[in-house]
Structures are given as structure tokens and as C-alpha cells.
């Protein structure tokens, strides 16, 4: 009894803070401001009220329902819908990281450029093919690092992540108060209520996927439900606190961006270099030169490296660690003496290399390539969130079978409606997000659209091939 009480020591504020560090980042503010300008303030309010809050609480119920499961989403699907769909969920969770892995070395290069040169000129000095070749070399190097299991790098990454988190909050505080403390002039003039109201047109709709991408990943906090004291009350309280904290940071951060960058004339490379521009301007406001920007660039470099190494290794081991031989060939699961899944790493390398080099055939500018890959992530990554809502809908249908300690909505029809809404909204965001955010029907727009349509189908479709290969191997 004493042991059980000792295990459940997390309070609602612990849950809120742990979740906040996991879910939120300064890049979310910059990327969505680059897409929408100050209109994003309205978008944040909508997303947090009608999507993120129910999403987080749904994760809480699923984590409580399957408190002994170690596979996350795939465990939830396995218990509710069988091993076949559980395999597809696990495959989706892994394969959507491929565009993420292809984009991370780019982010490392950009951060290094700002840390060393104090500006964003590094990616302008070389051709796209040369830069993407260097990106591929970086990826191969960090794949080797991941295979060595360097724990010290993860510790450095954690410290860097905390530093970035603190600096993100510092940015909001210093930028919002700058007009009162310094003589800085607000870049966006004539701000009225109409400044924040979006024009609901096709251009606006195509940017929703980036908002969904920004607030996703709450399923990572599900293991903490059953470590929480009085989870039926404290966990949802922590989640609501999380939603308020993220909403405040998103809204104030967006307002701060509006003070620095004219909402009606957003720089074309803001998505690529905006984080560094922001800290550079902040240093100018307070007569600190490039100090804040360099500190942030160094912390971001280390954080991106750690995130890349972790994302190469962890999702793959989740997929292969508890692999069912009916769905995944044994050859793919083969490991070397250090426990590295060699063939799994090779498959990752092939897919990432294609995604790094193929776009250079039709995208001739590094800034556009970076933005394209980031937008592709906003289309592909939320596909894994769909399985969360599928699992929730299944749990609601099987309500008599499961008796979790925490239940989000006890009214079955209402719970089903919320689950379907979250699933439909995520799917809608993914579908509309495939359209490139640039002048339509140009050669590059068509090329990007083709890649945006083909990539999710190819990546998820590969998952349908492996069960056939496994069946063939097992028959021998």
C-alpha cells in the first residue's frame, strides 16, 4: 500500500510542467506566424479550445485504460482492434518520422551557420545540391552516433532543450515588455480587432496542418496518468493548466512576433531564420548585440542533434522491439552485437536519402526546400495522431469492457462525437496541408504538390508490403 502511494506522487502542476516541455517549442510560434501573421492569434484560440484540450484529455483516458501497456498507440489499437491494425499503427508511428529525420540535419546546418557567422548567409553560399549532400553526410554521421548509443549526447540534448525552453519564455517576456522599457517601435502598425480575424479562404485552410503539427504529440505523456495522485481530478486539471500555459505562450509569442515583424509584410525566409532574427532583434532592443541569438543558436544546435539521434533510434526500436513475425520479416529485426537493428537502420537511410536528394530535382532554392520539408512534416506527422482517436472511439464503443481510473467524457454519444471530431479535423488538416504555400500552378508548385501527395502514400504503403514479405519468408 505504501509503495502504491509512493508511486502516485505527481501532482497536477508536475503534469502540466512536464507536458509543457514535451509539447511546446518556440519554433511553433515562428512557423505559424510566418504562415498567418497576427491572424494566428485567433487560430491558436480555436485550436486550443476545440482540438488540443480534448486531444490531451483523450490521451489521459487511453493511458489510464491501458496502464500496463508499453507500446503506446500500438498497444491501444492491439487491445481494441487486433494485431493487424496494431502493426499498421506502429508502422505509421515510425514511418512518419522519415520526413522529420530528413529535415533535422537542415535545421542543424542553419543553427550552426547562425552560431558561427551571426547571420543566415551559410545556406546562401552554396548550391542546393551541395547543401543537401552535406545534409545527407550529417545524417549518416549522426546515424552512426545513434548506433553507438551515446547516452552523454542525450544528457547534453536535455540540457539544451531546457535552455531553449527557458529562452523561449524569456523571449516572450522581454519582447512583450520591450515597447514599455525601450524606445522600440512596433513593426505592425494600426492593429485593430480586424487584424486578428482570418479570411476563411483556401490559403488560410492550407495552413491549419502546421497548427495541428505544433500541438501534437500529447500521447507521449500518457504513461504519467497512473503515476498521478487522484488521477480522476488532478490529471485533467494538469491538462487544462497545460492548455492555458501553451495558449498564453502561443498568443503572447505571436503578439511579440507582430511587434518585431510586420504582419502585413512577412519576410520570405521567416520560417527558416525567424527564430534567430527574433533573438537578434531582441538583443538589439536591449543593447546586447548578438549575445542572445548566439546562445539560442548553440542551444538549438545541440537540441536538434539530440532530437535527431533519439528519433533515428527510438521509434525504430519501438517498431521492431515487439515485432510480430506475421507482419515484419525477421531479417528486418536482425541486430548486431551492440543491439542495433542493422537492416532497420539501412531502410531508414535509404528512405531519408531519397527524401533529402529527390527534391533538389525541382526545388532550386534552399529556403523554399526547407519550408517545403517543414510543411511536409505538418502533413505526414499528424497521421499518427489519427490512431489515437481511432483507439479512443474503439474504447468508447467497448465502454463496458474497460474501467479506467480516469474518464474524459462519461456520456457515450458525446464522447463518440468528440472522438470523431478530432479524427475528422486531423484528417482534414492533413489533406488540405498537401497544397504548397506559394504561387499556384508554377512548375515548382506542381513538383511540390506531387511530392506532398506521393510521400504519405509511399511511406504508409510500404507498411502493406512487409506483411507479404513476412508471409513469404515464414512459408519457407
UniProtKB/Swiss-Prot annotation:
Q: Which InterPro entries match?
A: AA/rel_permease1, APC_superfamily
Molecular function terms, GO-annotated = transmembrane transporter activity
According to the record, the segments passing through the membrane are 10-30, 39-59, 81-101, 126-146, 155-175, 196-216, 241-261, 292-312, 344-364, 376-396, 415-435, 449-469
- Record keywords, A-Z: Cell inner membrane, Cell membrane, Membrane, Transmembrane, Transmembrane helix, Transport
Give the Cytoplasmic compartment stretches of this protein.
1-9, 60-80, 147-154, 217-240, 313-343, 397-414, 470-476
Q: Name one GO cellular component term.
A: plasma membrane
Q: How does it sit in the membrane?
A: Multi-pass membrane protein
Q: Where in the cell is it found?
A: Cell inner membrane
Top-level taxonomic group: Bacteria
Q: Which residues lie on this side of the membrane: Periplasmic?
A: 31-38, 102-125, 176-195, 262-291, 365-375, 436-448
Where primarily located? membrane
Q: Work out whether the entry's keyword set contains Transmembrane.
A: yes
Q: Which family does it belong to?
A: Belongs to the amino acid-polyamine-organocation (APC) superfamily.
Q: State what protein this is by name.
A: Inner membrane transporter YcaM
Amino acid at each position: 500500500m505504501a509503495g502504491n502511494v509512493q508511486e502516485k506522487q505527481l501532482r497536477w502542476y508536475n503534469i502540466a510542467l512536464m507536458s509543457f516541455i514535451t509539447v511546446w517549442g518556440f519554433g511553433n510560434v515562428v512557423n505559424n506566424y510566418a504562415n498567418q501573421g497576427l491572424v494566428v492569434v485567433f487560430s491558436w484560440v480555436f485550436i486550443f479550445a476545440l482540438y488540443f484540450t480534448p486531444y490531451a484529455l483523450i490521451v489521459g483516458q487511453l493511458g489510464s485504460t491501458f496502464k500496463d501497456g508499453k507500446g503506446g498507440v500500438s498497444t491501444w489499437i492491439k487491445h481494441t482492434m487486433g494485431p493487424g491494425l496494431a502493426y499498421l499503427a506502429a508502422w505509421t508511428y515510425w514511418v512518419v518520422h522519415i520526413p522529420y529525420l530528413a529535415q533535422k540535419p537542415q535545421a542543424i546546418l542553419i543553427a550552426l551557420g547562425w552560431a558561427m557567422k551571426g547571420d543566415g548567409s551559410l545556406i546562401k553560399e552554396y548550391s542546393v545540391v551541395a547543401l543537401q549532400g552535406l545534409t545527407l553526410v550529417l545524417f549518416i554521421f549522426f546515424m552512426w552516433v545513434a548506433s553507438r548509443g551515446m547516452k552523454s549526447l542525450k544528457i547534453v540534448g536535455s540540457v539544451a532543450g531546457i535552455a531553449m525552453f527557458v529562452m523561449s519564455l524569456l523571449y516572450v517576456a522581454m519582447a512583450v515588455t520591450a515597447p514599455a522599457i525601450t524606445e522600440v517601435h512596433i513593426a505592425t502598425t494600426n492593429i485593430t480587432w480586424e487584424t486578428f480575424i482570418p479570411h476563411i479562404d483556401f490559403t488560410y485552410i492550407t495552413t491549419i496542418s502546421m497548427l495541428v503539427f505544433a500541438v501534437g504529440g500529447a500521447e507521449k505523456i500518457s504513461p504519467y496518468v497512473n503515476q498521478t495522485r487522484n488521477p480522476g481530478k488532478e490529471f485533467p486539471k494538469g491538462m487544462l493548466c497545460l492548455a492555458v500555459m501553451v495558449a498564453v505562450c502561443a498568443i503572447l509569442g505571436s503578439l511579440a512576433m507582430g511587434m518585431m515583424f510586420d504582419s502585413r509584410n512577412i519576410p520570405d525566409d521567416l520560417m527558416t531564420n525567424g527564430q534567430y532574427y527574433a533573438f537578434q532583434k531582441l538583443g538589439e532592443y536591449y543593447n546586447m548585440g548578438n549575445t542572445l541569438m548566439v546562445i539560442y543558436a548553440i542551444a538549438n544546435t545541440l537540441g536538434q542533434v539530440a532530437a535527431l539521434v533519439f528519433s533515428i533510434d527510438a521509434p525504430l526500436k519501438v517498431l521492431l522491439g515487439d515485432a510480430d513475425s506475421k507482419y515484419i520479416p525477421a531479417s528486418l529485426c536482425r541486430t548486431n552485437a551492440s543491439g542495433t537493428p542493422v537492416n532497420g537502420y539501412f531502410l531508414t537511410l535509404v528512405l531519408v536519402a531519397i527524401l533529402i536528394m529527390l527534391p533538389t530535382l525541382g526545388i532550386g532554392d534552399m529556403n523554399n526546400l526547407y519550408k517545403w520539408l517543414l510543411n511536409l512534416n505538418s502533413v505526414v506527422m499528424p497521421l499518427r495522431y489519427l490512431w489515437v482517436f481511432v483507439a479512443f472511439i474503439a474504447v468508447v464503443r467497448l465502454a463496458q469492457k474497460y474501467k479506467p481510473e480516469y474518464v474524459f467524457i462519461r456520456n457515450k454519444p458525446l464522447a463518440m462525437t468528440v472522438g470523431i471530431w478530432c479524427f475528422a479535423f486531423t484528417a482534414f488538416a492533413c489533406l488540405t496541408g498537401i497544397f504548397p504555400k506559394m504561387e499556384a500552378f508554377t512548375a515548382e508548385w506542381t513538383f511540390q504538390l506531387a511530392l506532398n501527395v506521393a510521400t504519405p502514400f509511399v511511406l504508409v504503403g510500404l507498411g502493406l508490403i512487409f506483411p507479404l514479405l513476412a508471409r513469404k519468408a515464414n512459408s519457407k
